[in-house]
Amino acid sequence: MTVTVEPSITTGPIAGSSKAYREVAGPDGVTLRVPLRRVHLSTGADFDLYDTSGPYTDPNAVIDLAVGLPARPGLVRDRGTQLQRARAGEITAEMAFIAAREGMSAELVRDEVALGRAVIPANHNHPESEPMVIGKAFAVKVNANIGNSAVTSSIAEEVDKMVWATRWGADTIMDLSTGKNIHETREWILRNSPVPVGTVPIYQALEKVKGDPTELTWELYRDTVIEQCEQGVDYMTVHAGVLLRYVPLTAKRVTGIVSRGGSIMAAWCLAHHRESFLYTNFEELCDILARYDVTFSLGDGLRPGSIADANDAAQFAELRTLGELTKIAKAHGVQVMIEGPGHVPMHKIVENVRLEEELCEEAPFYTLGPLATDIAPAYDHITSAIGAAIIAQAGTAMLCYVTPKEHLGLPDRKDVKDGVIAYKIAAHAGDLAKGHPHAQERDNALSQARFEFRWNDQFALSLDPDTAREYHDETLPAEPAKTAHFCSMCGPKFCSMRITRDVRDYAAKHGLDSEEAIEAALEAGMAEKSAEFADHGNRVYLPITQ
């Protein structure tokens, strides 16, 4: 770390909860401490949640960003990749750790990795990372993009964004820096990141040739990849599917090639009128990544950047090539996931998942959104979360977040949180729709707290306790309001849940606690009214008495 940096980061537990650990036995007698966020309910019970925040929410942890986070136990560097070891029937320390995190069996984790339907991004040189899995059999994950640009940001700001994003649930981070101090920025992020870190090596390679794509070479790119592998990057986006013959297919698009990596490689192919060096040297690239157990994230350089271009010939031609490259990577023991679009209207989203599964041997799908409409700049975290929820239900394993600044500028701290929360909603909605084990438990716990007017429990169980409390307290800030049987929306007279509870209390008081009892009460009431009608001479209309 050659650059002096003094980041200011947020630490300490999330409101209403504490950092806790579950100890599980790993291979070779290693004890693994699996992190979780423990919510303390007013009922006296605890509710445990998946936690991505690392030591930053642990009040007992010593945080020194200049030193970095401690290495995880059980790390093995000389036994091959997670894919190779899974195929050999081995349950690694990472698999045991993940099984405890996901509430699944270690055998399931191993089998999904062995089949190529899940990946464990865990570079041997990133021991600070807490193991996680990306695959459709597991909870849908969320990636947060950070990184500087030539125009703005600093190392300190990007480290802060990383800590902030993981606090709110980012499962992985991608450092997409394109400005100054790319190597140093990545080093600070890696040494302090509790989650896997991904990159797009072509960005740094382009910076080395002063931004001229035509000056790129395989040798320069290869050395950049090795440099990043040595640092500890866990997965790399490689746009090896952008072939020379596919570039003309984008000519009539509304928005052309919108992927930075895709446009760089398209420019190189056209300038040299040769096939992409990423494609022609792919097997050598596999050998490099296998040495470090770095996961391929095969990039969708020809993804659609507008609704008009969704599911076109260029997009799916590249996807077919990514399927071919997937087979090659797996043959070299390298883990693979596939990147997906982009901008896709809702009725065309599922086709993307089905085709990816068919062409790419069910390798985990990792999608940017997709945005379901193009008309809402400043709200693209919403337009894309709509598409993200649909594609998650269909089988996408990881969602790359989109922030409100998409298409407008570099996201700041607030944008990062807004993007992460929007995508945690989409991911969880996808898990619910898939019937993922345990997904509904949190919904049930929060709904029960809502019905019982346990306001503090509602806040603590939510994705964003701080904002939930803030919104409630804007109109009812007094502490007694935290136990009140209403909020400022309906007030004490019109709260549907309070009225429902009153009805239930009345029913309980009068023994109406079953369908049979209610039916009997109804019959008795009808009989009473029938007798009353007879007593009045069976007359429909009675004279008015003064």
UniProtKB/Swiss-Prot annotation:
[4Fe-4S] cluster binds at residues 487, 490, 495. HAMAP family: ThiC. It comes from the Bacteria. GO terms for cellular component: cytosol. It catalyses: 5-amino-1-(5-phospho-beta-D-ribosyl)imidazole + S-adenosyl-L-methionine = 4-amino-2-methyl-5-(phosphooxymethyl)pyrimidine + CO + 5'-deoxyadenosine + formate + L-methionine + 3 H(+). This is Phosphomethylpyrimidine synthase. Its cofactor is [4Fe-4S] cluster. Coiled coil: none annotated. Its EC number is 4.1.99.17. Zn(2+) binds at residues 343, 407. The lineage of its organism: Bacteria, Bacillati, Actinomycetota, Actinomycetes, Mycobacteriales. GO terms for molecular function: 4 iron, 4 sulfur cluster binding; carbon-carbon lyase activity; zinc ion binding. Keywords: 4Fe-4S, Iron, Iron-sulfur, Lyase, Metal-binding, S-adenosyl-L-methionine, Thiamine biosynthesis, Zinc. Substrate binds at residues 145, 174, 203, 239, 259-261, 300-303, 339, 366. GO terms for biological process: thiamine biosynthetic process; thiamine diphosphate biosynthetic process.
